[in-house]
Amino acid sequence: MSDPILNLLKFFNPETSHSLSLSLLKIAHKLHLYSLLGIKFNFKNQDSLVFKNLTFKNRLGTAAGLDKNADYIECLGALGFGFLEVGTVTPRPQIGNPRPRVFRFSKHNSVINRLGFNNKGLEHLINNLKRSEYDGVLGVNIGANKDSNEEQRIKDYLICFRGVAEYADYITINISSPNTPGLRDLHSNNNIAELLNEISLEREKLNYKNPIFLKISPDEDLNTYQNIINAVIEYNLDGLIATNTTIQRDQSSSSSITDTQGGLSGRLLYDKSNEVLKQIADHSKQNLLIIGVGGVDSRDSFYNKLKLGSSLVQVYTCLLYTSPSPRDAHESRMPSSA
């Protein structure tokens, strides 16, 4: 998308801007305007990755939340990413939390959201997956409905797992959104063991051979991360996605940031997510594949995630601030929208 259009979209509230951006991208793709408008990332000299039976054509993919309902698979896939992750999807549709629920902090290339797993539900997403002609690696991020109690919450994950298994190249279990009350309780030792045991049994029933990842919070202590790593290995999951958004705020942050509730993402998450990434990489001893996400907005920050121990990297928030361009491959930014 051209910079003038991107600048115009910034006059809308962040959630509306996000929806309009994706809609315009979809139209441009259908009309074969990507080349004319310079809408494509250049991943020149980037290496591929083979993991299990999947080939990631490059190391950069989109994070869950960008395309919650798998409505934009083709137009996002045509940008050149190595993989896409859609969702988070819940069994039943839900509208999420009241608006306004997304807040842009442009000075810091950061966003706070309290969306609350708003999505059109499992059936809608599955129908889109069935229709998709995307030939790259496609992951699906699954969650639980907000009104589900503890017992039903695990059932929600199993319902989504069964629903998407036929179509997902990998599945991500999202236990880390801060905007669904009680969801992060699944990080505790007993809860994570119960959840992953059920997921493991379901995997065997379905003979699901593709990778399963667990997406974690950046707000836990080292002991919790060690327990999670042990559980992920014990129940034969394949890796971790580090990290989701943070509810913690730096003391030096402005009052507008510290006073806004929700999950913080973008550049202000970068250091914190990197700390967790390094801890996870050090303690998993290369037994797990790690996907790094959080605050990547340059070539340097992309490669730093890889140096810290991730094999793949995801982006989302910084796509709200920049647009893909052919010049990206020749500048210090990696592509800038990373």
Regions found by a protein language model. Name each.
Residues 13, 62, 84, 125, ...:
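Conserved, mostly hydrophobic/aromatic
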Residues 64-67, 216-221, 289-300:
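Glycine-rich beta-to-alpha transition loops that act as phosphate-gripper elements at the mouths
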